[in-house]
A protein has these predicted regions:
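Beta-lactam-recognizing serine transpeptidase/beta-lactamase-like catalytic domain environment
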Residues: 1-132
C-alpha cells in the first residue's frame, strides 16, 4: 500500500508503521513544519489555542515521564497527546493537496462588521520538501 491509498482508505496500520519507523520526534518536527501546534491568527483572536504536538522532550518536561513506543504509534494517527484546531488541519490538508504551497487564511471584516469573502489567496512560499 502507498500513502495515497492509505489516506484514501484511512488505513491506520500503514500510519502506525510509518510512525514506528520515524519516531515521535521526527513526526513532531514535520507536523510543526505544516503549522500544527502554532497559532494561525496570532493576536487577532484572544481565544485562539496553539494546540499541542508532543515530543519526547515535551513529555519529559510536562509529565516527568519517558516516551514509550505505543505513544508514538498512536501519534501516527493523530491520537494520544496531539491537540490541533480545525483551521490548522484545514491549512495542512490544503498544503498537501496543492503540492506544498502554504497559505494563511484571511478574514476581512467590512464597515458593517460582516465577514466578506476573499477572491484569491496568495501563496507565501512553496514547501514541497514535505510532500512526496
Amino acid at each position: 500500500m502507498n500513502l495515497r491509498n492509505a489516506m484514501k482508505q484511512s488505513c491506520d496500520n500503514y500510519f502506525y508503521e510509518i510512525a514506528r519507523k520515524l519516531g515521535v520526534d521526527r513526526l513532531s518536527e514535520t507536523a510543526k513544519k505544516f503549522g500544527l501546534g502554532k497559532e494561525v491568527f496570532g493576536n487577532l483572536f484572544n481565544i485562539e489555542k496553539k494546540g499541542l504536538i508532543p515530543s519526547t522532550q515535551w513529555k519529559k518536561n510536562a509529565l516527568g515521564q519517558s516516551w514509550v513506543l505505543g505513544e508514538t504509534i498512536i501519534t501516527g494517527i493523530g491520537q494520544g497527546y496531539i491537540q490541533t484546531t480545525p483551521i490548522q488541519l484545514c491549512l495542512m490538508t490544503a498544503q498537501i493537496a496543492n503540492g506544498g504551497y502554504k497559505i494563511y487564511p484571511k478574514i476581512v471584516i467590512d464597515d458593517e462588521n460582516k465577514v466578506s469573502p476573499i477572491d484569491k489567496f496568495t501563496p507565501l512560499y512553496k514547501n514541497s520538501k514535505n510532500i512526496k
